């Protein structure tokens, strides 16, 4: 019988864990979790997995209640920590990750058995997850990538030196909280922001330090609805913008690629609140609301509120709105 038959006969485990393991062996996944509850994965050193250092899979059911803490994961072929499926009540705390070559250093995803689903058909997904105190660096994708997660609380992490974005809240992320993080030197490929919300609603981005990323600090793209961007400091996010404009905060109704039309839409980024952020250093704009993209499966951005932000006096326009639809832009402050 194959290994799959063995898995199918397993009784789900509870109150179990892995501690103080050190391995450089190129396993597919160094640690696998299949439908186990009340788990502890702590103080392990996991190097050279061909896929993930720690994989929490939905293949045989969901995991509820778990702590992934104090692990060091280097040089893996995919995501260092992968949470795929309808898992909940997880704490991902104080891990050090470098050199992940997949989607992200930490990936939290609603993909069902690895397959993408439409955002308006999502009825389950990873939720009630805390991601705090982690240091993620040198990844080939994003440092942190969320797909269709909700009620995920991402705080006090350092996300740096990734080829793509520092963090992406993507494809139906709802009601997540991203606060007090340091997001630095991401988007090495060029033309990418430090923080991206792509098809996400009701997320809060609060009090982050976003600097030295490759194009913009914080970007809402395609459909971003009712998000709150508040109290962030965005500095010098234009070092490798590759001809694109750069702004501290960028609101874009970008077109949806043909291959993604079955999964996401390009309605536009509407009803977002951008409040009390500080934007200085190398950008073209403090806040930029882009023109419409209705001809290319995109949309228009409207009814956003841009207020009480502080912008460098070096910008020709602290806040610029090129959309055909109306937004509120007032009471912003130019710094000396």
How would you describe each model-predicted region?
Residues 1-7:
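Short, small-residue-biased leader/transition segments that mark boundaries at the very start
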Residues 11, 16, 29-34, 38-39, ...:
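Solenoid scaffold repeats with emphasis on beta-solenoid/beta-helix
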Residues 25, 30, 47-48, 53, ...:
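Residues in short coils/turns that link rungs of repeat/solenoid architectures in beta-rich domains
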Residues 53-68, 74-89, 96-128:
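Solenoidal tandem-repeat scaffolds enriched in leucines and small polar residues
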Residues 59-61, 110-125, 189-190, 240-244, ...:
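Intrinsically disordered, low-complexity Ser/Thr- and acidic-rich flexible linkers and loops
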Residues 296-336:
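Leucine-rich solenoid repeat scaffolds
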């Amino acid at each position: 019988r194959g290994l799959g038959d063995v898995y199918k006969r397993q009784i789900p485990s509870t109150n179990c864990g892995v501690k103080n393991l050190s391995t450089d062996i190129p396993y597919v996944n160094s640690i696998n979790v299949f439908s186990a509850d009340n788990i502890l994965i702590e103080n392990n050193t996991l190097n050279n997995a061909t896929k993930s250092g720690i994989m929490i899979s939905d293949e045989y059911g969901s995991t509820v209640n778990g702590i992934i803490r104090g692990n060091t994961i280097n040089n893996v072929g995919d995501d260092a920590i992968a949470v795929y499926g309808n898992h909940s009540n997880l704490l991902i705390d104080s891990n050090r990750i470098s050199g992940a070559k997949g989607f992200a250093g930490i990936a939290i995803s609603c993909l069902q058995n690895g397959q993408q689903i439409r955002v308006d058909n999502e009825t389950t997904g990873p939720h009630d997850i805390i991601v705090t105190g982690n240091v993620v660096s040198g990844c080939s994708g994003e440092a942190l990538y969320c797909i269709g997660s909700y009620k995920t609380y991402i705080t006090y992490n350092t996300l740096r030196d990734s080829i793509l974005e520092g963090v992406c809240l993507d494809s139906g992320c709802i009601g997540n909280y991203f606060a007090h993080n340091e997001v630095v030197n991401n988007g090495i490929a060029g033309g990418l922001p430090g923080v991206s919300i792509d098809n996400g609603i009701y997320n809060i981005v609060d009090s982050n330090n976003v600097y030295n990323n490759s194009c913009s600090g914080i970007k809402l793209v395609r459909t971003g609805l009712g998000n709150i961007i508040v109290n962030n400091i965005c500095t010098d996010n234009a070092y490798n913008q590759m001809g694109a404009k750069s702004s501290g905060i960028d609101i874009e109704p970008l077109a949806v690629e043909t291959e993604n039309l079955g999964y996401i839409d390009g309605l536009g980024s509407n009803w977002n609140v951008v409040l009390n952020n500080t934007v200085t250093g190398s950008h073209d704009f403090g806040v930029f609301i882009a023109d419409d993209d209705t001809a290319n499966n995109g949309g228009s951005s409207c009814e956003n509120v841009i207020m009480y932000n502080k912008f460098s006096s070096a910008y020709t326009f602290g806040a610029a709105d090129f959309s055909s639809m109306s937004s509120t832009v007032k009471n912003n402050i130019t710094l000396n």
